[in-house]
Amino acid sequence: MKLSKPKYIFVTGGVASSLGKGIISASIARLLQARGYSVTIQKLDPYINIDPGTLNPYEHGECYVTEDGAETDLDLGHYERFTSITTSHANNVTTGKIYQCVIDKERKGEYLGKTVQVIPHITDEIKRRIQLLAQRKEYDVIITEIGGTVGDIESLPFIESVRQLRYQLGARNTALVHLTLIPYLAASGELKTKPTQHSVKTLLENGLQPDILVLRTEHPLSAELRRKVALFCNVDANAVMESIDVPTIYEVPLVMHRQHLDEVVLSKLDLPSEQEPDLSSLQAFVDKVKNPKRTIDIALVGKYTELPDAYKSICESFIQAGAVNDCKVKLHYVNSEKIDASNVGEKLGKMAGILVAPGFGNRGIEGKIEAVHFARTHRIPFLGICLGMQCAVIEFARNVLGFKDATSTEMDPATKHPVIDLMEEQKGITAKGGTMRLGAYPCSLVPGSKAAQAYGTTQIQERHRHRYEFNSEYLKDFESHGMKAVGANPDTGLVEVVEIPDHPWFVGTQYHPEYKSTVQRPHPLFVAFVAAALAGKDDKKK
């Protein structure tokens, strides 16, 4: 269906953070897609950083990279995984970007001597960014998730901008979905609605009346409680949704559909709901995730393992690849700083597969190299991503080629054997933010390689986030000793994929395959890696 002008859905959160606004936003998008509407989702983040590219993963979780090279919030990963929509720079807006743009305009004299203020200048820029996606004329519905919690000082300009937009666009062209928490007090055995009432009251104080409430809860909500929330929050009873904890986030669209959330949204937007959604493929996927035939143990070796959100896309890629292989991937997060030669067997010996995760810097690097060595010498299926691939190269150089001091110039600029080196175009760059090799680039695979077999083609395009690369001066040494470069950029020759052909499954990628794995198209490398781990597990039993 193609509308002449898009409709807008705004998603806010109250009571507490981390309730799942991104999951609800993605679920609404998936349901509207199933009804024939073209949808996109954007995230407004209230922090003053320009983007999360320089944020510590412990502060923010994963930095998700889009096809066009934007470093964005991890919620954009949810959007793409749920819907297979390709996002871009325009899908993630921060307070930092807004203020930077307004200040740049002021310096250029575009405000003609006016006093630059939050209202109207900041709010006007926010509204412009919200409506930027509409200029593509590709979407029927634009969903905008407002980061943070209603009542936060940082979110106020965004809330005011939404109020103005709803007024300007008209009541039938926008809908406001508010996600809140219904806490359970174990001492009294009660579910409490007061925090939700106060959250809605805070919204009302800022001029916004929610159209739909989604109530996060650990326990089922009674019809009476939902009627109470509807009455005191001034929301239609059929627009109060229960979002109870479920075994997998991919079940949330199905839970929302059973409560007719998509029908309520379409009604609020004055859109027809004639096409019944076909969610059979999603239901089949969820059934596989919830009812695996087998379990497989795979280690994720990294230095941010205390916060799994730092590797969110990798984790979700394994869930999707597990479903394809009718198994559950049990991820074991192993801190690379705590791995050495004396304990690597204890930590990784029972694993059916080992993934060495991406990262930056010297901390934990020797533990990652030790994990690579264990996977290579014990013939355990291995996948190295970005720095993980570079660690595979370093390990091979040290222990097979005999270059004992081989490393990356990131770790030791004076090394005699820089098998990983700073990219030529990066050598004059000093700024940190947004200056890496980012976004999608083409890659040509060697026919017959494990990577080409996994993809089913030799021409691929994958997303990147790095400054360092394989040093091609050493390529002949590596290939003559058994590590092959089986993927390269067709324009520059930059090595993108390495393999050890006589190993059961040993693949390293300079790019990030996890960024392109979705429910509808689980990434072929993860699917092949999990299949190899299962095969290796079966061989050990024989």
PLM features: what roles do these ranges have?
Residues 1-330, 337-353, 360-361, 368-374, ...:
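Flexible phosphate-sensing "switch/lid" loops adjacent to ATP/NTP-binding sites
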Residues 5, 209, 236, 294, ...:
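A generic structural signal for well-ordered coil/turn residues at beta-strand boundaries
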Residues 438, 442, 446-542:
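C-terminal and late-domain segments of enzyme folds
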Residues 59-67, 246-250, 356, 377-383, ...:
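Short beta-alpha connecting loops at secondary-structure transitions
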Residues 274-277, 383-384, 403-409, 460, ...:
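Acidic/polar loop patches that form or flank catalytic/metal-binding clefts of enzymes
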Residues 19-22, 26-30, 34-36, 347-442, ...:
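Cysteine-nucleophile active-site neighborhood
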Residues 13, 43, 217, 244, ...:
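Active-site proximal loops enriched in glycine and acidic residues that flank catalytic Cys/His/Asp
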